[in-house]
């Protein structure tokens, strides 16, 4: 009996890849390994509907799906290493599994802040278990401190305010999302949070945490010397690729300073024979010649299609590869098409408080569109990013 295709990581990218294998007609064994005990689930609702108690169901596929598709799903199974010469992966229980092809889809883990004391009431948010714990503690919280005003931090701030909890949001950058969207857009996001009563403190970080006599967090001391009272703390300072299990594999990894991850070509093929990478952990080759990770929900499905087609020897499918991501904060959906960069030129097309539209450009050519509260208007511009489009033409057409 031949070895199966083994997918390490039962998140969205791993699931989409398993689905694509069956959709493409692959009839061999498919083994999906996940280190969590929960079947594949949707992460975006964790910081929003789930933590607010509005939904309990984040499952991506019903239990019978895997049996129907003849996909073997093994949960609670941690992979600790890979031998690319022998084509085997090692498990935490000491056993090994042979593979015909290996697909790495291990995703990310939350970045920790070094030096913070280990006290009760301090959380990160990545896994379902994190969200469950956070939701349980939110019920009795009165004042929350969120460290980091990236997407997770901003979404949690909105969810906590909706739950009636006072929120202090601390961010070392000049504005929320500055390193992702730039300071000008970050200022518009900051305005929204300030309007909702968030105590937003930018340009400072957290130096240490305070704890009460019972060992539970009671507040923080910032790097500027100010103090914050809090009975709930969330650290949201980004994530790092889960690649430690590949340390001795010989598979080429991106440098940590460049974002880390598994280096791969434009279809997910890594430096090792019969080894592929997909999803948040994968630094794919892009049209610009740069290899980088794209941490977007829609990218997981797009990459899975390209990878599976290449793995099975087919021609690359014709498909739009315009990146898309979104973030729900309060009653506003923030959407981005393309790749926004703080280094690009920015044109604010419209700004009506909770609704705004902006174009990013480089050398006059559109590189990204970002909008808040303008869902239809943003999505209509997707085609403009598929081919070089001068921003001046868009502005002229809009009158």
For each of these PLM feature ranges, what is it?
Residues 27, 73-90, 97, 163-264:
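A Rossmann-like FAD-binding core segment of flavoenzymes
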Residues 1-6, 61-145, 221-223, 232-236, ...:
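FAD-binding core/adjacent interface of flavoenzyme oxidoreductases
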Residues 2-4, 281-375:
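Mid-to-C-terminal Rossmann-like scaffold of FAD/NAD(P)H-dependent oxidoreductases
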Residues 375-392:
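A short, polar/charged loop-to-alpha-helix boundary motif
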Residues 120-141, 216, 227-302, 306:
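FAD-site-proximal beta/loop scaffold in flavoenzymes
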Residues 1-71, 159-180:
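Beta1-alpha1 glycine-rich phosphate/pyrophosphate-binding loop at the start
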Residues 133-181, 185:
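Rossmann-like NAD(P)H-binding beta-loop-alpha module
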Residues 9-13, 35, 126-127, 147-152:
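Glycine-rich Rossmann-fold phosphate-binding loop(s) that bind the pyrophosphate
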């Amino acid at each position: 009996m031949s070895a199966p295709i083994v997918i390490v990581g039962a998140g969205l990218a791993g699931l989409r890849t398993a689905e694509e294998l069956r959709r493409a007609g692959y009839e061999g064994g498919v083994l999906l390994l996940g280190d969590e005990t929960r079947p594949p689930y949707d992460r975006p609702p964790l910081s929003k509907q789930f933590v607010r108690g509005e939904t309990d169901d984040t499952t991506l596929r019903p239990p019978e799906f895997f049996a129907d598709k003849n996909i073997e799903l093994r949960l609670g199974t941690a992979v600790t290493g890979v031998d690319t010469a022998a084509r085997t992966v090692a498990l935490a229980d000491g056993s090994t599994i042979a593979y015909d092809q290996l697909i790495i889809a291990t995703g990310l883990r939350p970045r920790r802040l070094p030096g913070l004391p280990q006290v009760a009431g301090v959380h990160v948010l990545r896994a379902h278990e994190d969200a469950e714990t956070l939701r349980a503690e939110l019920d009795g919280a009165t004042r929350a401190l969120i460290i980091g005003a990236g997407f997770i931090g901003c979404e949690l701030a909105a969810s906590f305010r909706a739950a009636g909890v006072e929120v202090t949001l601390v961010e070392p950058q000049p504005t929320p999302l500055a390193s992702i969207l730039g300071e000008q857009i970050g200022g518009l996001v900051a305005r929204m949070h300030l309007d909702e009563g968030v105590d937003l403190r930018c340009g400072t970080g957290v130096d240490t945490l305070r704890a009460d006599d019972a060992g539970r967090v009671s507040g923080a001391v910032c790097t500027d010397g100010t103090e914050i009272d809090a009975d709930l703390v969330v650290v949201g300072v980004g994530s790092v690729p889960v690649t430690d299990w590949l340390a001795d594999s010989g598979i080429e990894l991106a440098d940590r300073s460049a974002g880390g991850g598994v280096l791969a070509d434009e279809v997910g093929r890594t430096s090792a024979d019969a080894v592929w990478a997909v999803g948040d952990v994968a630094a794919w080759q892009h049209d610009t010649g740069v290899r980088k990770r794209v941490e977007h929900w829609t990218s997981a499905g797009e990459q899975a299609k390209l990878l599976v087609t290449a793995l099975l020897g087919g021609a690359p499918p014709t498909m739009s590869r315009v990146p898309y991501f979104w973030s729900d904060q309060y009653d506003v959906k923030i959407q981005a098409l393309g790749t926004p960069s703080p280094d690009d030129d920015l044109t604010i097309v419209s700004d009506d408080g909770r609704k705004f539209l902006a174009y990013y450009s480089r050398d006059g050519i559109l590189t990204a569109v970002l909008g808040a509260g303008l869902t239809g208007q943003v999505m209509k511009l997707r085609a403009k990013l598929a081919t070089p489009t001068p921003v001046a033409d868009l502005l002229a057409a809009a009158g």
